[in-house]
Structures are given as C-alpha cells and as structure tokens.
Amino acid sequence: MRFLLYDRVTSIDKGKSITGIKTFTLTEPFLDRHFSRKPLVPSVMFIETMAQLLGWLIIYSHDFQLTTFLSLIEGANVPPGLRPGFQAEVHAEIASTHSRDSLGRATLHVEGVQVACIERIIYGHFHKVDPHLLRRQFGYYSGLEEL
C-alpha cells in the first residue's frame, strides 16, 4: 500500500462499522513541493481515507475471505482543502453486503465537526485471496493487536 491514509483503527464492529483516526501533517509525502505558500490537504485525500477504512471493514466482516475494489462513489461532500496539522476521526459503516458487492457510507470529523462525507460507496468483491496474508496485513495496518 503506497499511501496508508489512516493511522490506526480505534473500533470495529464486524458487519456494521469501523472508526479510525488520521493525523494530517505538513510532512505528508503528497504535500512535498506541491504547495509553495499555503499547503492544503487535497480533498481527494479525505475521500481516500474514508474509502480505505470502509474497504478494510468489508474485508474484516467477510473473515478475510475476499478483498475489495472500489466501483462507485456518490454524494461525496468534501472541503476545498484544510491546512495540515489536524487529526481527523473517520467513521464508516456497511449498509448492505452480499457475496458480490457491498454498499456503505462514511464521514470524517475534525474536532467533533463533520467536514466530509460520502453518502454511497460501492465495493466489488474479489474472492481469490490469501486470507492469512489479509489477516496479517489488517492486524499490522489497523494497530489492533487481537488479530
């Protein structure tokens, strides 16, 4: 994973929801030489952060027997950019999940105020995976020790 856009998972409820945090700092690789006078976190990074957490929730909820690929985002509301130096809390939930795809939604809050959301995210499922590898990756990337 080239850009892991969350720092850790703070809670997960199988088949239902996931919450995680991300601290956006001035030293983010995607800000390097991108903005000369007033660095701003690009809005697409908020979308990617929310999408990554929802993707892992789906994989976790299916017992690491599949991986996901993003197929649709609708109703995305994101800020035009925020200055680095803030911590975001991301919450994502599954609305429905089946063997072929999953539907979810996500929000991103800064200091308790919702600043971004995606009303509808659809992920397709890919079933030819190594469940043990996915479980190890999730344990490492999430910061959850019990996996």
Where on the chain are the PLM-derived regions?
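Short, hydrophobic/aromatic-enriched beta-strand segments in well-ordered soluble domains
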Residues: 22, 91-94
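Catalytic strand-loop segment that frames the active site of acyl-thioester-processing enzymes
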Residues: 1-41
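Hydrophobic core residues within well-ordered beta-strands of beta-rich domains
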Residues: 3-5, 88, 102
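A short, structured loop/turn motif at beta-sheet edges
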Residues: 11-17, 81-84, 111-113
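HotDog/MaoC-like acyl-thioester-processing domains
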Residues: 84, 93-147
